[in-house]
Amino acid sequence: ESIEGTIKLYNNQVFIADNIKEVIPEFLMLLKGVIDCPDLPLNVSRSALQNDGFVKKISDYITKKVADKLSGMCKTDKEEYEKYWDDISPFIKFGCLKDTKFCEKMSDYVLFKNLDDKYLTFKECLEENKDKHENTIFYTNDPVQQSQYVNMFKAEGIDAVVLKDAIDQPFISQLEQKNENVKFVRIDADLNDSFTEEISEDELKDATEKLTETFKKALNRDKLDVKVQKIKDEKVSSMITVSEESRRMQDMMKM
């Protein structure tokens, strides 16, 4: 079943059309309702609507009213707002990417669900974790597949947020562009110092030499640098990490 809503347009109770994207922004197409406006042109050709200044004002007004309603709900009844968030989240984030004014109004009311299913704003994510990883927000896009890392984060008292929607990657890239010092890092992107412990120089040297030789033979490569770190959690025998930059580049190449 389609989740697309229906906005019917009328001019003095005369039906014109429905779901005209020049009037209803694409990211608000899940809305349902009626607009009756005597100033709407009866000619609904695309070119006519695109060149009609009043139509643009109506579109901006609808966007503003939706942003005001959602931000107001978040301010006055955040618990109720959270009930809707998982369903509306992709549309709000898409709207923030498409519409600068909508983004300005909604940026403080975009929520992120953490590992304990608690909803936090962008600012709250940074504030709650500034003592352990300032200006870094860790995230998981698959808590089940990345459960080993999730458990390690929980054991060390380090928080992360869940970002499972396709829109999340371009959205967090936009947030990073607007907040130059902030980085989103997937929980399997690197081995945080909190998850390692120091070992003696002799032990480190011995382990590095043995593992380097092992991997050179296995990969059939004479030139290979191996960095060895001891994982604090004895239940974890090894970890595979890919830097955030490399992984995002790989994801872009797949698109």
Where is each model-derived feature located?
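Conserved GHKL (Bergerat-fold) ATPase module
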Residues: 1-255
